[in-house]
Amino acid sequence: MSAATVILILLMLLGILGRSNVIAAAAAFLLLLQFTSLQRFYPILERRALEAGLIFLVVSVLVPFASGRVAPRDMLQSFVSLPGLIAIASGIIATHMNCQGLELLQRFPQMMIGMVIGSIIGVAFFGGIPVGPLMAGGIAALLVHLMAWLR
């Protein structure tokens, strides 16, 4: 059994233990590709899977607008109320941090294991919800930058 297979199995198990269906499913999918000798699709997935996933994520967020469940008046409220402005600022900060997290994970993919373990601890002991590696990566990137700044 190759080291890559062991890592994917470990990630899948950690995802299951941490109740992170996304990590577990992604690892299982890659294992399926490995076991069916379809690794030739890895380069395509590496280039396009994140983009495809983000498209589906944005589609799911936009469905309330498309279905008419969010009225134009509600949208305008987000620009003139304090909670709305806080939400806009939070979105800006979160997307920037997610970008930093993605860059960190691309440079240091081995950090994924630590983030999954951290997610498991967060879910098991702190009532957290495992939402994905980008936010954890964003926070890790912030902490790495902070540590470098403090040196």
From Swiss-Prot:
Keywords: Cell membrane, Membrane, Transmembrane, Transmembrane helix
Keyword tRNA processing: no
Disulfide cross-links: none
Membrane topology: Multi-pass membrane protein
Membrane-spanning residues: 6-26, 52-72, 75-95, 111-131
Cellular component, GO annotation: plasma membrane
InterPro entries listed in its UniProt record: UPF0756_TM (IPR007382)
Location of this chain's protein in the cell: Cell membrane
Similarity-based family: Belongs to the UPF0756 family.
UniProt protein name: UPF0756 membrane protein Moth_0120
Organism per entry: Moorella thermoacetica (strain ATCC 39073 / JCM 9320)
